[in-house]
UniProtKB/Swiss-Prot annotation:
This is Isoleucine--tRNA ligase. One of its GO terms (biological process) is isoleucyl-tRNA aminoacylation. Belongs to the class-I aminoacyl-tRNA synthetase family. IleS type 2 subfamily. It catalyses: tRNA(Ile) + L-isoleucine + ATP = L-isoleucyl-tRNA(Ile) + AMP + diphosphate. Gene3D superfamilies: HUPs, Isoleucyl-tRNA Synthetase, Domain 1. The gene is ileS. One of its GO terms (cellular component) is cytoplasm.
Length: 1086
């Protein structure tokens, strides 16, 4: 008679990558992703923003990590009843696209691009930005991330760009924009300024060695200075110096040709150092560093005055380039000058330093900037014209030496900002730009930030909060080509000034009388009109050349993606801010920040309510993943080898989701370990269920009515795990959710299934056996739904299998044009087409038996600790031991499970005691990190008292040295007395077990019998016998086994479904060793 099989034939050794490919086909052919959205029509929505990547490069592990996190919460919120639209987006404008195009076209720089043609250049950018779009879709789909590519928004689309124009005009109307010439970080390689936050992205700072030089400036007012000194000292008229020189130190010698002032600290002490009728002025704290250069012995006494006394003195320019510049070449006191590196005197070049510009402008000194867009000196510095500034340092030093102004050159190692696109060192340079007045509303951003739930939580007030507190005005214009043009037109005649700012295509079309098909340059640049404010009619309104900083466009994503306010106005108002957003932690200076700036300025609301800042992924040695270093595998290769679920678990169960680093090896060993230790145990439970349910022709059902103690326990653990997963994901904590899954399957496999094997294996198909199958089925089905967002493809496979459908069979049906019946979403439905169309399980009708869980967990703890002791003492599990002594206050509960404990750890007797003090003492372990912060001055006394045992447990808490410790400041650990062997603590260090390790001859014989059972079971497996086959057994041994067979023969036969016989032709023969004695084992199927 053929058995009825209710489940697919499931292999224990499965190719998870191949299974995942079948799952992807099933989802695509059956349109599961779209159904997961459609089935939730009418439900409340969960909104998350998909940060737009560039498509001119392949995705890396960082992109995949972010994608995994997005997918987990989108899937989870869907099965929690939310409608979750998932729209992909592309960042298209900006430097990444331009630099790639320059490389491909073989051109470089603004002049070369202009000569090539802006239209042709931008057309190339337009094509190149989507170069890898299909590859992106391949990677994203393979990682099992559900997202809509067909309706993806692009920042280069006309509708998106129009929303950006609207935002700009709104800011303009709110008086939150201004134009100014200010010193900014400047990329001479890209010929564009950068925002201050762009210098904080990723590893923008690099260690760099520069030449730092000290130069002397000759002061003009010799008589005046002599007078200042003589007021403070006994100096006589004949002691007057002929020349005074003030020493300044700089790490940027190339800025010295543009020097216009010097700055000193008001309260800093400055020394007058005499050397050969020349007096050098330097901060007193820096004199020792210049002893050699100034010829000092170290025994000299110097006149000292405060820096404020030097204010107003003038000096001779180092060079004659700007010698007639008004109000220049004077000394000013300022608070930003500090002692430390250098001389305590700072040279001011207002065209190349932000502090320099602010100070000089306050003194009526206009800046000069003799460096062009490519970082080369202009004709204002004729002897350096065309020289790149960094290449000019040595030439300048030589000239200073020739002039007698040079004092010293040093090699100075410091962290210096580099361009995030070209990796070239930045310069600071005055450039004209449009700015958002962030400083005007930064306090409001700080307030709105308190409404956001940040993960990790300390980002709110530290990494992001402090950044907001120190926010500066944001430069949003770039003198580049491929980007949304600033909608600003100016009169070309300063006699008739006028500025027009446009916030829509309609406004532009109305004023210029043309149809706008493309907002990009050069088409938009060609739009001109007569200046309405010019009565002569001769001046013309022309658009300024600049385009938007691409970060402004990224920050406009919430409204730009839906063409707000020109379309979807009601939808946007109802769906803003987003419920969720995720990117890596540096985006606190990037996308998160620009979203916050624009959301606050435009809507006075935070842009999102929950935000995960994940960490970065590095190679196994802690280095950044790099094509050049070849230190990471192509993700697709990893997917094809281990599957993407394994990589998902590896990443999202690690600390990287808490903002820390994740080191991943190139060979994928870490991912393989995840497969082996996390996913395979889940599969093993599924495999066990299907193979034995099919063998017994039994079908499992969702049923929680069994009163079997193991069933009640595992179902209670199931509900606890389901609740924990829900709680964790509600709190945006995948790490804890994955731990809950792993912990549950550890108990399911290594406790419930193992302790229930006799129920599954027995011949009778009674209620107890059916309850076991129902319980295991219920655990698998409920957990499959609960963990479906965490392990989407393996969960789908198991879910389908539990409904007697192999994914391969489904795909065959679909390929033949046969459709699967779609069941409506309903809690009462036993089956939906996909696990991802189910509702999250609540198990509301089942009550957790907490008392049983607590007791059984202690039983499990006792057994696992006992087995660990056996392993440590090299005593195999099949070797029986005489007894275990359990010393606990909860022995009454444990006694109900005495037989289970005896069987599990293989002991004959369990002894219960409660006199713990006779076997162990409690040792106080202090949490130094927490306690040290609260009681730093008492720590030494507390440590000494803890070592001496001078503490007391009171009703108020643990008392020591006159203090009551908080529960998180200490732990009490049971420490068994040294003469007692075979011990372990359990029940949170409140109880002790002692395993009797003495072996008698009787115990040894029984251990041999159990070994023989194991040998026979292994032979059955190798002979490929079915689990139900009965067999003949013959044992041929070098030593006499008759006593063992006489005493334990029935036990051996029962365990192996065998009968002892001789003189038969075996199906399988094996040779094994029992305590160094050879045994030949023969088996034959009956």
């Amino acid at each position: 008679m053929t058995n009825t099989k209710y489940y697919p034939d499931v292999s224990a050794n499965v190719d998870f990558a191949a299974i995942e490919q079948e799952i992807l086909k099933f989802w695509q052919n059956n349109n599961i992703f779209q159904k997961s959205i459609d089935y939730r029509n009418g439900e409340s929505e969960f909104i998350f923003y998909d940060g737009p990547p560039f498509a001119n490069g392949l995705p890396h592990y960082g992109h995949l990590l972010t994608g995994f996190i997005k997918d987990v919460y989108a899937r989870y919120k869907t099965i929690k009843g939310k409608k979750v639209e998932r729209r992909f987006g592309w960042d298209c404008h900006g430097l990444p696209a331009e630099m790639q195009s320059e490389k491909e076209l073989g051109i470089s720089g603004r002049i070369a691009i202009t000569n090539f043609g802006i239209e042709k250049f931008n057309n190339h950018c337009r094509a190149s930005v989507m170069q890898y779009a299909s590859e992106w879709e391949q990677y994203v789909t393979r990682q099992a991330r559900w997202v809509a590519f067909k309706n993806a928004y692009k920042t280069m689309d006309k509708n998106f760009m129009e929303s950006v124009l609207w935002a700009f005009k709104e800011l303009y109307n709110k008086d939150l924009l201004y134009e100014s010439m200010r010193v900014m970080p400047y990329s001479w390689a890209c010929e564009t300024p950068l925002s201050n936050f762009e210098t904080r992205l990723d590893n923008a700072y690099r260690e760099r060695t520069d030449k730092a030089i000290t130069v002397s400036f000759v002061l003009n007012e010799v008589t005046l200075i002599n007078g200042i000194i003589s007021q403070k000292s006994d100096m006589k008229e004949g002691d007057n110096f002929k020349e005074y020189r003030i020493l300044a130190w700089t790490t940027t010698p190339w800025t010295l040709p543009a020097n216009l002032a010097l700055a000193v600290g008001s309260d800093i002490d400055y020394a007058f150092v005499d050397k050969n009728e020349v007096c050098y002025i330097i901060a007193a704290s820096s004199v020792a560093k210049y002893a050699k250069e100034l010829g000092l012995s170290g025994k000299e006494n110097f006149e000292i005055i405060k820096g404020l006394k030097l204010q107003g003195l003038s000096y001779k320019p180092l060079f004659n380039y700007f010698e007639n510049h008004p109000n220049s070449f004077k000394i000013f006191a300022s608070d930003f000058v500090v002692e430390g590196d250098g001389t305590g005197i700072v040279h001011m070049a207002p065209g190349f330093g932000e502090d320099d510009q602010i100070l000089c402008e306050s003194k009526g000194i206009e800046l000069v900037c003799p460096v062009d867009n490519s970082g080369k000196f202009t004709k204002e510095i004729p002897d350096l014209e065309g020289v790149q500034v960094f290449d000019a340092n040595d030439k300048i030093i030589i000239k200073l030496k020739e002039q007698g102004n040079w004092i010293k050159t040093e090699q100075y190692i410091h962290n210096y900002p580099h361009c995030w696109r070209t990796d070239t060192p930045l310069i600071y340079k005055a450039v004209p730009s449009w700015y958002v007045r962030v400083t005007k509303f930064k306090d409001r951003m700080v307030e709105l930030n308190q409404q956001i739930n940040w993960i990790p939580h300390n980002v709110k007030d530290n990494l992001f909060g402090k950044w907001l507190e120190n926010a500066r005005d944001w430069s949003i214009s770039r003198n580049r080509f491929w980007g949304t043009p600033l909608p600003v037109w100016k009169s070309d005649d300063p006699k008739y000034p006028r500025i027009d700012v446009y916030g829509s295509i309609e406004e532009i079309e109305k004023d210029f009388g043309v149809k706008i098909n493309d907002l990009h340059r050069p088409f938009i640049d060609e739009l001109t009109r007569t200046n309405p404010d010019d009565p002569t009619g001769k001046s013309t309104m022309r658009r300024i050349d600049d385009v938007f900083d691409c970060w402004f466009e990224s920050g406009s994503m919430p409204y730009g993606q839906v063409h707000y306010p020109f379309e979807n106005k009601k939808w946007f108002v109802e769906h803003f801010p987003a419920d969720f957003i995720v990117e890596y932690s540096s985006q606190t200076r990037g996308w998160f920040y620009t979203l916050m700036v624009l959301s606050t300025a435009l809507f006075d609301r935070p842009p999102f309510l929950n935000c995960i800042c994940h960490g970065v992924i590095l190679d196994a040695t802690g280095q950044k993943l790099s094509k050049r270093l070849n230190n990471y595998a192509d993700p697709l290769e990893l997917f094809d080898k281990y599957g993407s679920d394994a990589l998902r678990v590896t990443m999202l169960s690690s600390n990287v989701v808490k903002g820390q680093e994740l080191l991943i090896d190139k060979d994928g060993k870490m991912v393989f370990d995840t497969l082996r230790l996390f996913i395979k145990p889940i599969w093993n439970a599924y495999h066990f269920f299907t193979i034995y349910a099919n063998a017994d022709s039994l079908k499992g059902t969702l049923n929680f009515a069994s009163q079997n103690v193991l069933d009640v326990y595992i179902l209670s653990k199931l509900k606890i795990a389901v609740n924990k997963i829900e709680e964790s994901l509600d709190n945006f904590d995948t790490q804890t959710a994955y731990h809950a899954v792993s912990e549950f399957f550890e108990v399911l496999n290594n406790w419930y299934i193992r302790r229930s094997r006799a129920r599954f294996w027995k011949n009778e198909k009674d209620t107890d056996k059916q309850n076991a199958y129902n319980t295991l089925y219920s655990c698998l089905k409920i957990m499959t739904i609960a963990m479906s967002a965490l392990i989407p493809m393996i969960s789908e496979t198991i879910y389908q299998g539990l409904h007697n459908t192999a994914i391969t069979q489904l795909n065959c049906l679909l390929s033949e044009g046969k459709h699967i019946v779609q069941n409506p979403m309903s809690d009462t439905q036993d089956y939906n087409t996909s696990v991802h169309l189910c509702n999250y399980p609540t198990l509301s009708d089942f009550e957790i038996n907490y008392e049983l869980v607590s007791t059984m967990d202690n039983v499990l703890d006792i057994c696992s600790n006992s087995l660990f002791i056996r392993s440590t003492e090299n005593i195999r599990v099949r070797q029986p031991l005489a007894c275990i002594t359990i010393i606990s206050k909860h022995n009454n509960n444990l006694k109900d499970f005495e037989d289970l404990i005896k069987d599990e750890i293989n002991v004959k007797t369990v002894i219960y005691r409660d006199d713990l003090e006779n076997y162990a003492r409690k040792k106080l372990s202090l949490n130094f990190a927490i306690l040290g912060k609260r009681l730093p001055h008492k720590m030494k006394a507390i440590i000494d008292a803890a070592k001496k045992g001078e503490w007391e447990a009171t009703t108020l808490g643990l008392a020591i040295c006159g203090e009551i410790l908080n529960s998180d400041e200490y732990t009490l650990i049971l420490e068994p007395y040294s003469h007692i062997k075979g011990t372990a603590n359990f029940d949170n260090n409140s109880s002790l077990l002692i395993l009797n390790l003495e072996l008698t001859s009787e115990l040894i014989e029984e251990g041999y019998a159990r070994d023989i059972v194991r040998f026979i079971q292994y032979a059955r497996k190798e002979a490929d016998f079915s689990i139900t086959d009965r067999i003949l057994i013959e044992i041929i041994s070098e030593f006499d086994l008759s006593k063992i067979i006489d005493h334990y023969g029935d036990f051996i036969k029962e365990q192996t479904l065998g009968e002892f016989a001789k003189n038969f032709t075996p199906d399988y023969v094996s040779k094994v060793a029992l305590e160094n004695n050879q045994i030949q084992l023969k088996v034959k199927r009956l």
